[in-house]
Amino acid sequence: MRSSDHMAFAGVLPIVFLLILSSADLAASQSQPGPTNQPYNYGRLSPAMAVIVVILIAALFFMGFFSIYFRHCSGVPDAGVSPAGGARSRATVNAAARGLDVSVVETFPTFLYSDVKTQKLGKGELECAICLNEFEDDETLRLLPKCDHVFHPHCIDAWLEAHVTCPVCRANLAEQVAEGESVEPGGTEPDLELQQVVVNPEPVVTAPVPEQLVTSEVDSRRLPGVPVDLKRVKFSRSHTTGHSVVQPGECTERFTLRLPEDVRKRIMKDWKLNRTNSLLVLPRGGSSRRGKPIDRSRARSDRWLFRKTPSFLWRSRDDGSIRLGATGSVRASAVPNSTGSDSVRAGDRWAFLRNASFLWRNSSVHVPRGGVNKDGEGTSVKSTGASGSTSGSVRLPV
């Protein structure tokens, strides 16, 4: 039982109690014998009884009125509605309570405003109906294909998490998905060609600007007796908080993206193709590049040597060796270039000083055990050969 039913039941109880008391008083008064001079003894309706009857009728009237009102506002289907219609209404109410599914929202296309700015019909600027900001050229738009209204993706996604309608025109997007309609409106290719032949027989009507002018003239010449879309007038637009921020009758063209039919079809087709490609899982292939075999035991010890030593313990010497605190030194001699200069050693020393320790990558530095000289320093390993690929060489990342 709903809260409205509890309130109505609580209001009826005092009235029924007063009615029972008044009935008891009326019965007691009728049981007493009347005066002997009156030939007929008819019971009279006392003023208190009349007031109680009026109050009871008014209470029943208000109970019925509020019951219908609360039932209409809560969206509960009437008893006369068919089971299929009632199930559809309940599904719509449940969908409105939880919003649209993320997979359904992802079917609405997104694109840059600069891609359609020069192709849209009309010269006015577009703006988002939720945040009320005009679109910039580098901003992304999300189009609702059912009503052609555009928004920022983060704005409309947050709205559709709790709603199933368009914030501008209140078009129910859940009904479109439930009925199995296609997201892209329109018929097949032959139907579109037939419509173009029938609707656009004159070259003047095919131009986009006269088409818009004709539409505005038809709307301005609407007769008073012609019914207007009451749902659009009543729910013109709602903000993210739910209250209406656009007055009825206000122009909403600044929220609507009008595109030629061929451009619109191309955008929808490209969006579907991109979504299909994004869902494909490409097989992972092996790399064609092969390196030289590495001694894993030596590599583990080398990695431990370079990773466990902090960067502040490095110190460069003038002879090109690198000292590792009290653990010893790893000396990398410079490789002479074609001019015979010693520029490589200076460059290596600068790299050792300026780069952090975690950026180093050694190829084959091996520190033998027990190698301590008389000065208390570890033995140094010198690189031999012009290529610098033997033990003791240090490679910098490219």
Swiss-Prot record:
Q: Which residues cross the membrane?
A: 50-70
Is the keyword Translocase assigned to this protein?
no
Query: What induces or represses expression of this protein, per its UniProt record?
Result: Up-regulated by chitin or cellulases elicitors.
Per UniProt, the RING-type Zn-finger stretches lie at: 128-170
Query: CDD domains given for it?
Result: RING-H2_EL5-like
Q: One MF term in GO for this entry?
A: zinc ion binding
Question: Region Disordered: which residues?
Answer: 368-398
Give the enzyme's main class according to its UniProt record, as a single word: transferase
**Annotated compartments:** Membrane
| Recorded family membership | Belongs to the RING-type zinc finger family. ATL subfamily.
Q: What is known of its domains?
A: The RING-type zinc finger domain mediates binding to an E2 ubiquitin-conjugating enzyme.
The protein's name is: E3 ubiquitin-protein ligase ATL6
